Structures are given as structure tokens and as C-alpha cells.
Regions:
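N-proximal, solvent-exposed amphipathic alpha-helical segments enriched in charged/polar residues
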Residues: 1-18
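Charge-rich, low-complexity N-terminal segments
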Residues: 2-3, 7, 26, 57, ...
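Short edge beta-strands and adjacent turn/loop segments
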Residues: 14-30
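Solvent-exposed beta-strand sheet faces enriched in polar/charged residues
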Residues: 23, 32-34, 68-70
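Histidine-centered active-site/metal-ligand motif
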Residues: 28, 47, 63
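A short interface-forming secondary-structure element
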Residues: 33-45
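Charged, amphipathic alpha-helical segments and their flanking helix caps
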Residues: 43-44, 48-53
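C-terminal structural segments of small proteins and small subunits
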Residues: 51-79
Length: 79
């Protein structure tokens, strides 16, 4: 079974993040990801970066992953 912790681990191993949190119920998950890697990228490009960290899990194991992606500067303005 997929857990929020396993998704968080996949993302953390695949990209440098300043903040990362994942919650979910085993089928539907929500992630908040803050990374400098998102600078200059649009929302689709940011999501593609995260999907790359998940590999085949997005097609085979995870039904839905909702993401909020921010640069560190954007994240600071959200607080």
C-alpha cells in the first residue's frame, strides 16, 4: 500500500526541497513542495519535475496526487 511517507521519500530522494509534506488516504494524496528547482518554471513543468521523482509509481500505484509547488520565495510570501 502506498503511504504519504513513501511518496515523501520518493520526492526527497529525487530532488532537493526546502519544505516537503504529503498527506493522503492510500489512494488520494496532497503534497506541498518547496524547491529552488521550480524557479522559472510554470505549473506544468513543476509537476513534471515531481512526477519524474515518482517513476512508474504514478501510473501503477498512485491514483491521484494533488500538488502545490512553490519556490522558496513564493513559499515565504504564503506564510
Amino acid at each position: 500500500m502506498v503511504t504519504p511517507e513513501s511518496i515523501q521519500l520518493n520526492i526527497a530522494q529525487g530532488m532537493v526541497t526546502e519544505h516537503l509534506s504529503v498527506v493522503g488516504d492510500g489512494a488520494h494524496f496532497e503534497a506541498v513542495i518547496v524547491s529552488e528547482a521550480f524557479a522559472g518554471k510554470n505549473r506544468v513543468q513543476r509537476h513534471q519535475l515531481v512526477y519524474q521523482t515518482m517513476g512508474d509509481r504514478m501510473r501503477e500505484e498512485i491514483h491521484a496526487l494533488s500538488m502545490k509547488t512553490y519556490t522558496p520565495q513564493e513559499w515565504q510570501s504564503q506564510k
